[in-house]
Amino acid sequence: MIENKYYLEDYESISEEVKHLTNSLSRLKVLATLYEHPKSMKDLTADTGLSYSSVSSTMHKLELKGYIYRESSKYYLSNCMRLKIETILELNEIINTLNKFFNILDKHLVGVIPNESVAELYLIGQANLIESRDIEAYRIYNYIEQILNQANEVKCILPFYYENFNRQLDGLIENKIDVEAIVSDNILNIFENESKIENLSSFSQNKNFLLIITDEVMVLGLFKEDGYFDQNRLLISKNEDAINWAVNLFENFKNRNK
């Protein structure tokens, strides 16, 4: 799909070897089956549903390339092939994630997200997309205020100043809760004057996205191509992998802006 091609541009080039592995159904079936467990030729034929001749031909070609090897009566994936299969599985997860969240990725500024985090997008595959309508214009802001109210630790990237968020972050600091913020450089002066956040740094204003991480949840908001923040959509997740992804995104972004 076009959107997949577009968003995978920054996911560094996939080798021709990996492309070759994925363009044959019989090859994929055999490799996926061996990825789970070593198998005999008989078991492979039964498990894949392919004909014996098809399995035999595929196995012979894979063995010649060193992708698999035989020990006694069973076939095993080589270590390098196991790594390639894991790469393919990760790519598949990324594509599924892109399709699932197309509404928040399409026509939004996603190029500001560091490549290291783009390459691990599959980790947020279990996230949820919150969308609001005109009749509930403040839904996403209310949600953010709710999670901040329950937070025991906060890391955030703030591209704009919103008084209610600042008030809640100040309240957390008064209660001895750690808050670290990276803010857009065009509002740094406001935070320095109005906020109690001491662990504060800034980034160039053309690198816009909203990220809030607490001990329980991650929240990601993006800007639209017209330069305005999308007030109608947020990606949220309480999944541990997604929270870890968000923490890594925060650190990658901070390191890029030192």
Please state what every model-predicted region is.
Residues H37-P38, K74:
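Residue at a beta-strand N-cap/secondary-structure junction
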Residues R70-N92:
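Basic, amphipathic "hinge/linker" alpha-helix immediately C-terminal to the N-terminal HTH DNA-binding motif
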Residues S15, F101-E180:
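PLD-like (HKD) phosphodiesterase/transphosphatidyltransferase domain
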Residues S40, Q126, S132-A137, N232-N239:
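Intrinsic-disorder/low-complexity, polar/charged segments
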Residues I2-E36, D43, D47-R70, L89, ...:
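PLD/PLD-like phosphodiesterase catalytic module centered on the HKD motif
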